[in-house]
């Protein structure tokens, strides 16, 4: 969703990175008008410091995921030396989506508790979770190979009121997905939950 008019007078505001945020929790119905720019490209150029920040992981974080991702990256890069980092990042993202689909990962709202290395548990042990587990595990794998990535939260889906044409978006429509940053293309949305 892109800019709202007269944001200062409304309970919703737009952050510098284009998030729509509420000034306080919603307790009543909220109506606003917004438009969606499906092909909008954001942050086509991202400074080196910001790239490094968005491609880093805490030391010792999810060691199995890091080793698995780096092994795939090194093997594929060696087999395809002519392929640049952007194309390799796209291939790796597709590999992760294919893995989620082909290896019977499961969506559940009751995955139990995850420990300190949640991506390791998701990719190699439990193989189940809800959108936050799936998106964060995807982002951790992408960052493990140096690709700037982030988790995005918002809403997916809504119900249209046939009387007045408005769309009702409920808390049950809350969702998390991922974005990866690619040189010259900016942030690219990827919903790894959709692969399950």
What are these regions (language model features)?
Residues 2-125:
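Acidic low-complexity segments
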Residues 91, 132-133:
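Residue-level recognition of alpha-helix initiation/capping sites
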Residues 121-130, 165-169:
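Short, contiguous acidic/charged loop-to-helix segments that flank catalytic cores in large enzymes
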Residues 133-196:
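Hydrophobic/aromatic-rich core segments of domains that either
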């Amino acid at each position: 969703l892109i800019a709202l008019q007269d944001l200062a007078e409304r309970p919703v505001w737009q952050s510098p990175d284009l998030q729509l945020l509420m000034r306080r929790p919603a307790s009543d119905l909220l109506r606003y008008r917004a438009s969606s720019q499906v092909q909008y490209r954001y942050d086509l150029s991202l400074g080196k410091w910001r790239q490094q920040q968005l491609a880093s992981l805490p030391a010792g974080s999810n060691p199995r995921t890091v080793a698995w991702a780096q092994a795939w990256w090194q093997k594929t890069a060696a087999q395809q030396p002519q392929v640049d980092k952007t194309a390799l990042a796209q291939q790796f993202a597709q590999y992760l989506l294919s893995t989620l689909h082909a290896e019977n990962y499961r969506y559940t709202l009751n995955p139990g508790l995850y420990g300190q290395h949640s991506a390791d548990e998701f990719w190699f042990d439990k193989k189940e979770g809800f959108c936050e587990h799936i998106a964060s595990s995807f982002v951790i794998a992408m960052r493990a190979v140096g690709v700037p990535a982030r988790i995005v939260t918002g809403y997916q889906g809504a119900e249209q009121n046939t009387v007045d044409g408005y769309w009702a978006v409920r808390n049950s429509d809350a969702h998390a997905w991922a974005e990866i940053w690619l040189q010259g293309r900016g942030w690219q949305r990827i919903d790894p939950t959709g692969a399950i």
